[in-house]
Amino acid sequence: MVSAPPTLQDQAFRSLVRNEVLTVSDAECLIREFFPPLFKEASTQKKPKTIMILVEHWPYPCLHVGLLIDKPNFQIFQAILDGVDTWLKRKYRPRMGRLKKVDFRDAQHHASLDMQDEREGRDYLVGTLPKKQIVEDHSRTRKERLKLFHDLSFMSSLHEDKHQTLLLEWAKERTSFLHLCCEKLEIGAVEVSKVRNVLKFLQPELIKELKLNTVGNLSKLAKFVPFIRKMRNLQKLMLVRTFGTRTFTQEEKQNISKIISLFCKLSCLRHLTIDDVYFLTDQMKELLRCLEAPLVSLKITLCQLSQSDLESFAQRWNYSQLKHLCLRGVTLTNLDVTPLRDFLKRVAANLQTLDLEDCRMDDSHFRTLLPALIKCTQLTSINLYDNDISEDVLENFLHRTTNLSQLTTEMYPAPSEVYNESNYVIVEIFIQICSELMNKLMEVRQANSVCFGSSSCYDCDNRYLYEDDGDVTLCLCQE
C-alpha cells in the first residue's frame, strides 16, 4: 500500500522539530492539539530538548507516553522525566496545572481498558474535557501529587533495566511531589531487601497484577507475604518456580502456612497461576477454601497434585464464575479423576477454555472425564495433547461433541496406535488415522481449527501435526 504524502502541517512539524526551534514561549502559546503530533515527531527524530519543553507545558490532564510513542530510548525517557521535573518545580501553572497523570504503560494495556477508563485515558486526543473533569480541576488543590504510572520488573539482578533504575532513583527523591503508581509488578530472583525498599514507596493498593518467580527459594517468597497482604485490589497473581524437597522442615511448614493464608486477604483476586511450585501438594483444599472472590481463571502447571488435592476441586469453593482452567503438566496417571469429572460438570455452563496437555492420562481416565467434557458447551478452546488415548476412545469422544459448537481451537493427541514399540511415530499410520478421525469429526459438526499432534520427538523435540485442511507437519528429523 502506498502511503499518503505528508501534509503541509506534517512537514511543518518535522521542520520545527528537526531545527529544534521550539522555545518555552512558543510552547506557552501553542495550540493544544499540536502537542501530541509534535511529541511523536520529537521522539522519532530523537530530540530530547523538544520533548522536555513539550512535557513541561503539556496542556492535557494525562500524558500517555505509551500511547504516543513505543518504548522511548534512554535519552528520550530521561528528557520526559526532566520535563516532569521542571513542571513539578513551577510555582505557578495557570495553563499547565491540568496535568494530573503521566503514564508510561504501553498501548496493549490501554486496549484492555473498559470504555469509561479508555475515554478518560485518551483525553489528550480531544479538544474539550468532560464536564466532570473540569469541575474536579477547579476543586483540587495544587498540593495534590502528580501520578506517574509505570510497570516494574525485578526479574534479573544481572540485566537491570536502565530506564527503570533511573525512574526509581528519580521518583524516590520526589515522593513529596508525586506518586509512583505500579499496576503490574514482576519480582524474580533478586535481592529481597532491594525490592522491599522499592515496595515501601509504592502504593500497594494500586497493584493489580503480580508475578513472583523466586527460583526455588521458599523463604524469599514468604518474606513478601506482608507486602502482598496490602495489595487489596490485586486481581492477577502468578507464583512461579518455587521448588525443593518433599520433606519439609518446621520453618518450611510455617512459611507454607503463611503463604496459603495470604489468599484469604486477596478479596479481588480473579486470575491465579501456580507454575512449578513444589509445596502445592496436599495444600489445594486449604488454598481453595481461602479464596474469597470467584476466580475467572485457574492455571496450575508442572505441579504434583495428590488424590486429596484433586478431590478438593469438587468440594465447596468459589468457582461459580470460572471460565478458564489449565492443568498442563499435572500428572494424573496414578490418580482417580472422578473428582475432576464432577468439578467439570459443575463449571460446564461457564467454562470457555480447558487445557489438559501433558496430564499423562490413559483411556480409563478419558472415559471417566468424557461425560463431563461433552457438557462443556461454552468451550471455545480445548487442548488434550500428550495424553495416551487410543483411536477408539478418541473417536467416541469426537462423535459425541455435537453440542460443542462454540469451539474455535481444538488440539487432540494422536492416538496411541500411531507409535511403534520404541514410541516413534509411524508416519503412514499417523496420516491415515488422523485423516479418518478428522473425517469423523466433520460428519458430526463444522469445525474451525482442529489439530492432531503427536508427542514431541525424542531427537528434535517437535511434534508431527495433522491439521483440519489436511496439511501434515513432520518433525524436523523427517523433513
UniProtKB/Swiss-Prot annotation:
SUPFAM superfamilies: RNI-like (SSF52047). It comes from the Eukaryota. LRR repeats lie at residues 96-124, 179-203, 204-230, 231-265, 266-291, 292-323, 324-347, 348-375, 376-400. Keywords: Leucine-rich repeat, Repeat. The keyword Repeat applies. One of its GO terms (biological process) is negative regulation of apoptotic process. Interacts with UHRF1. Promotes maintenance and self-renewal of pluripotent embryonic stem cells (ESCs), downstream of LIF/STAT3. Maintains the pluripotency state of ESCs by repressing DNA methylation through the regulation of UHRF1 stability. Mediates the proteasomal degradation of UHRF1. Is required for the establishment of the blastocyst. Belongs to the PRAME family. This is Preferentially expressed antigen in melanoma-like protein 7. The lineage of its organism: Eukaryota, Metazoa, Chordata, Craniata, Vertebrata.
